[in-house]
Swiss-Prot record:
This is Transcription activator of gluconeogenesis PADG_03802. Transcription factor which regulates nonfermentable carbon utilization. Activator of gluconeogenetic genes. The lineage of its organism: Eukaryota, Fungi, Dikarya, Ascomycota, Pezizomycotina. PROSITE patterns: ZN2_CY6_FUNGAL_2. Residues 97-125 bind DNA. Residues 1-90, 164-208, 236-287, 323-384, 442-461, 598-617, 695-739 are annotated as: Disordered. It comes from Paracoccidioides brasiliensis (strain Pb18). Residues 189-208, 248-279, 339-359, 375-384 have a biased composition (Polar residues). CDD domains: GAL4. One of its GO terms (biological process) is gluconeogenesis. Residues 69-83, 171-188, 442-451, 720-739 have a biased composition (Low complexity). Belongs to the ERT1/acuK family. SUPFAM superfamilies: Zn2/Cys6 DNA-binding domain (SSF57701).
Length: 814
């Protein structure tokens, strides 16, 4: 009996004896094997000698004849296609297995991979370990597990899943499941069906979804009939990849809340079995904060290479979207918040008590109701940011949508359909709130109605609170269109020099000149190569940067000013005007500057030099000295040196010389004295403040508590002293007049001027310990016309590395 007969195959027909020598046949087998280098891993394609001692291959019988081999033909076809340059490229796996990683071979996404199956290593085929990045050295190895699509596969885990499935079949709990998913071959090697099932399903996914399914089935009887229909939130839309987060399966029938077919197939359980296995739907396992399912993180769609970075990014997004316990007043400003009602905020968002709590955190159908166009009736005004969450009603519920899990229809609508929050109707009248709440509540049984109602938490009424940000008066595009000429810094420096010579003594002028002379060569070196277009571009950069600082000044409650490198004021905050009395229009040069307070010994305008006086300048008509350097009609803003006393100005320019071309991110923090805005008409008298109370006002002198006699006209002697209100009046009946620091004329009725005796209230005293409100800020520096402050300033440079603007923040010393 030949070898063919022993193998059970028909004997080949007799043929002529072969004339091929053994040496030629061995050489031919060697060439055939060399053409198939990829088959060396398989024992079938490796040449094996037969018992006759001749070096013939597997495809040769004992008599030297060659029989056809199916495996050799398939291998030849594969090798032919592998050499084809037009063959489709193999898609690389996201993470190679350990064996392929060690061999530096291309692996696949399936586990076990085809190469390990061919080599018989399917039992030990698992994902390889990558080298940690530098920023992940401190992360534990357990946190670097790949996402859902890259779950680690192990044969032991697959065996445990099959044992659980077989036990459920024996108990009769899973009679409707597909038996083909549990079939294995005789060698205990997993089939492709087992690989796909074990790859996508994890024990945590099964546990979390079944737990939440039971929670929905327990409370489904208290659900409203209308529920939200959204394809992006339906688990059936994710059949290709079941999510690991708790699935909100919103079907049309609230009484039938079960898992979707895809989830039931992947989890391998039914709702009935999950209800018996998980008696506590809200146990500690469901609210494990370390599990991404609690926050609905879809880690696989975040395009992160590791789980550690995806969780960190997801938690930051969860905090940014405000999915936590956010007050109702802030909920409308959060991206992706659920249930922003276009009507009003109501206390009854999820119902009073556990009987009316919806199993879905966002109620019945807030999306369909809250974003309805105007004119349609709304029957549900529930909101995720509710008052009951404060009292602990929703403490056992998970937070709703976080990052990358909110449907696309939650995006902000157009401005015409944007809702506006008002809290006028229901918060003002509790009875209206209660009546509207009872009409919106679904009917419940008597047992739940007899439960005690928790106390209502009232929210202060916010009148006419509008949603949105204050619109700008201009856009950045207008800056590039309006700037046509460069700014004349040469004229600005000439005006600054003329002002310093008029105000300061020769010794102080020399100190300031030395400081400016130290940075003059640097200015010349950086500007000598600039042409007209560069100077225009420089001014556009300045205006664009100033446009950004306007929002900063409005949002910051600190007195702030922004000036050019010449010291000319370019922007000012409202708080600075309150503190110093300088109006914004005066500082920017839009109104005449009538200030006579230069920090001297009196308010007559005499400076520390003693001989020269400071001439107030008009923004439209320059003085004779300024006309020599400024073009006609150019507005002249106030210089920074006009706002500080002499010592503060000298100290500022000495620091500016060090910081202008020094540290680009450096800053200076020191103390100074700001000068109050005072005119010649700011005499001694009385004025009525915003609270209707009477207080004293004086020029640059000091306020005295002496008892002086006046004639009721309200005017002082002009010598820098202020007459107190408790003086004796003759009761002439004439109204007292006074021009305050802002130029407004205040008239005091004759009943006050004719009073025999009045004293200042404690709130109107000039003591620093009694400063409160805007009126208290105005009182600072009224004795000597100076406000002692601590201030911090820095220099911002442009693209040419030239000092562009100076930003200064002040805080009064009280």
């Amino acid at each position: 009996m030949t070898s063919s007969a022993r193998n059970g195959s028909p004997s080949p027909s007799p043929a002529l004896p072969s004339t091929t020598t053994p040496a030629e046949q061995e050489s031919r087998n060697t060439m055939t094997t060399a053409n198939n280098p990829g088959d060396w891993d398989s024992s079938e394609s490796r040449p094996q000698p037969l018992s006759n001692g001749k070096g013939v291959g597997n495809g040769m019988v004992a008599n030297g004849h060659q029989r056809p081999s199916t495996s050799s033909t398939a291998a030849s076809a594969n090798n032919a296609s592998a050499k084809d340059p037009l063959r489709p490229r193999r898609k690389k796996a996201k993470r190679a297995c350990f064996a392929c990683q060690r061999a530096h071979l291309t692996c696949g996404d399936e586990r076990p991979c085809q190469r390990c199956i061919k080599r018989g290593l399917q039992d030990t085929c698992h994902d390889g370990v990558r080298k940690k990045a530098k920023y992940l050295h401190d992360a534990p190895n357990e946190a670097l597990i790949p996402g859902i699509r890259g779950n680690l596969y192990s044969q032991a885990q697959a065996a445990r899943n099959k044992i659980n499935t077989n036990s459920q079949q024996r108990n009769g709990t899973n009679s409707n499941s597909d038996n083909n998913s549990t079939n294995t071959n005789s060698n205990n090697k997993p089939s492709h069906q087992d690989v796909s099932t074990n790859f996508f399903s994890t024990p945590s996914t099964n546990n979390y979804n079944t737990v939440y399914t039971q929670a929905k089935s327990r409370q489904s009887q208290h659900m409203p009939s209308r529920v939200m229909q959204d394809a992006t939130m339906n688990p059936s839309a994710f059949q290709a990849q079941p999510p690991a987060s708790p699935t909100f399966d919103l079907s049309s029938n609230p009484q039938n809340h079960t898992l979707s077919p895809s989830m039931a197939q992947n989890s391998g359980t039914t709702p009935s079995s999950s209800a018996s296995q998980n008696p506590d739907p809200y146990g500690p396992t469901f609210f494990d904060p370390s599990h991404p399912a609690l926050f609905n993180f879809d880690i696989a769609s975040m395009n992160f290479g590791n789980r550690y970075g995806a969780l960190e990014f997801g938690m930051l997004g969860h905090l940014a979207t405000g999915a936590g316990d956010t007050p109702p007043s802030d909920s409308a400003t959060r991206r992706g918040s659920i249930g922003r009602s276009s009507g009003t905020f109501t206390v009854q968002n999820f119902g009073e008590g556990s009987s009316n709590q919806s199993p879905f955190l966002f109620g019945g159908d807030p999306v369909l109701n809250d974003w309805n166009p105007a004119g349609q009736g709304q029957t549900n005004s529930r909101n995720i940011y509710n008052q009951n969450s404060v009292s602990g009603q929703m403490a056992d519920h998970p937070h709703a949508f976080a990052i990358e899990s909110a449907p696309m229809n939650f995006a902000s609508p157009s401005s015409t359909e944007s809702p506006q929050m008002t809290t006028v109707t229901q918060f003002d009248d509790p009875s209206v709130n209660f009546s509207s709440r009872t009409t919106l509540m679904p009917p419940t049984n008597t047992q739940h109605q007899q439960q005690p109602q928790p106390p209502r938490i009232s929210t202060p009424s916010l009148k006419n609170m509008q949603v949105g940000v204050k619109r700008r008066y201009r856009s950045p595009s207008s800056i590039y269109e309006s700037v046509k000429e460069p700014y004349s810094y040469t004229s600005g420096f000439h005006s600054l020099t003329a002002f310093i010579q008029r105000r300061f003594s020769p010794q102080k002028t020399l100190q300031i000149a030395k400081a400016l002379a130290s940075i003059r060569p640097s200015f010349i070196a950086t500007t000598k190569t600039l042409n007209q277009d560069d100077l225009i571009f420089m001014e556009k950069c300045f205006q664009r940067t100033l446009w950004e600082y306007e929002d900063f000044i409005d949002a910051c409650g600190t007195p702030t000013i922004v000036c050019r490198r010449t010291g000319e004021i370019a922007a000012v905050g409202k708080e600075f005007s309150i503190l110093t009395g300088w109006k914004k229009e005066v500082l920017l040069g839009k109104e005449p500057n009538l200030n006579v307070n230069t920090g001297g010994s009196s308010s007559s305008g005499v400076s520390s030099r003693g001989s020269s006086t400071y001439n107030s300048r008009n923004s439209a008509t320059m003085t004779v000295m300024d006309n020599q350097s400024l073009p006609t009609g150019r507005t002249q803003p106030v210089f920074l040196a006009e706002l500080l006393d002499d010592d503060s100005v000298i100290e500022f320019y000495e620091d500016f010389a060090k910081l202008a071309f020094g540290d680009s991110r450096g800053s200076v923090m020191t103390t100074c004295k700001l000068l109050k805005y005072k005119t010649k008409e700011d005499g001694v008298g009385l004025f009525r403040n915003s609270n209707g109370e009477v207080s004293a006002a004086g020029g640059g002198g000091t306020a005295a508590d002496d008892t002086d006699a006046n004639d009721g006209a309200g005017a002082g002697a002009g010598d820098g002293t202020t007459s107190a209100v408790n003086g004796v009046s003759n009761g002439s009946g004439n109204n007292a007049t006074n021009v305050n620091a802002n130029g407004n004329v205040n008239v005091i009725p004759n009943d006050l001027s004719g009073a025999s005796s009045m004293k200042l209230s404690p709130k109107q005293a000039w003591g620093k310990s009694r400063i409160a409100g805007e009126a208290g800020m105005n009182q600072l520096g009224f004795r000597d016309g100076k406000v002692e402050c601590s201030y911090c300033w820095t220099v911002k440079r442009d693209v040419f590395d030239i000092p562009m603007l100076i930003v200064m923040n002040f805080l009064p010393c009280i």
